[in-house]
């Protein structure tokens, strides 16, 4: 009985550790913790068709300002 409890405890710890490692609660990229910036970067990413535009917009202010220029002609 004690050995089966030990096995269950070890399995529980392994599952808990893996769950924390592969959690989907990632922190926002760069400055996209701000809702407004994240929303604008998503719109520009969709319009540009460039794969990494969203992350570039979130990290670099220059890309963010180009995004603003693209949205407000």
Swiss-Prot record:
Tissue/organ expression: Expressed by the venom gland.
Family membership noted in the UniProt record: Belongs to the scoloptoxin-03 family.
Signal peptide: 1-23
Primary location group: secreted
Keywords associated with the record: Disulfide bond, Secreted, Signal, Toxin
Protein name (Swiss-Prot/TrEMBL): U-scoloptoxin(03)-Ssd1b
Keyword Chloroplast belongs to the record: no
PTM note: Contains 3 disulfide bonds.
Subcellular localization(s) per the UniProt record: Secreted
GO cellular component: extracellular region
GO molecular function: toxin activity
Native species: Scolopendra dehaani
Domain of life: Eukaryota
């Amino acid at each position: 009985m004690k050995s089966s409890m030990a096995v269950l405890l070890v399995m529980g710890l392994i599952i808990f550790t893996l769950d924390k490692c592969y959690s989907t609660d990632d922190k926002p990229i760069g400055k996209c913790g701000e809702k407004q910036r994240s929303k604008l970067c998503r719109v520009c990413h969709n319009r540009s068709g460039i794969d990494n535009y969203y992350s570039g917009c979130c990290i670099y202010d220059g890309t963010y300002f180009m995004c603003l220029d693209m949205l407000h002609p």
